[in-house]
């Protein structure tokens, strides 16, 4: 587990540097050109690194296994209200469609992470995560 954790840590430090460079370049370009820009990074899965159980790898039963990072930046002021909001990966489609200006039948602002009307829905998962907030009404 220690070797896996060290390898994973090194990979994450490298990824963080790449993401920093991409976001910095995106922000600088948006500011220079005045072009409305949205930048998003969403991991495809979590990774257990021995924090909750004595194993490393994919896990659907520990927070390290099902929590994933979301990085979101927009040159528009409106999406900044999304800071520190909980987000579920299955809510990515409404967010991306909204950012692209695409509307659809049965569109619900409550599902759009960047909307002022967004409402968090706690996922129905078998694993226990005491840090997940309850659903918003």
Can you annotate each of these PLM segments?
Residues 1-137:
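Catalytic domains that recognize anionic headgroups
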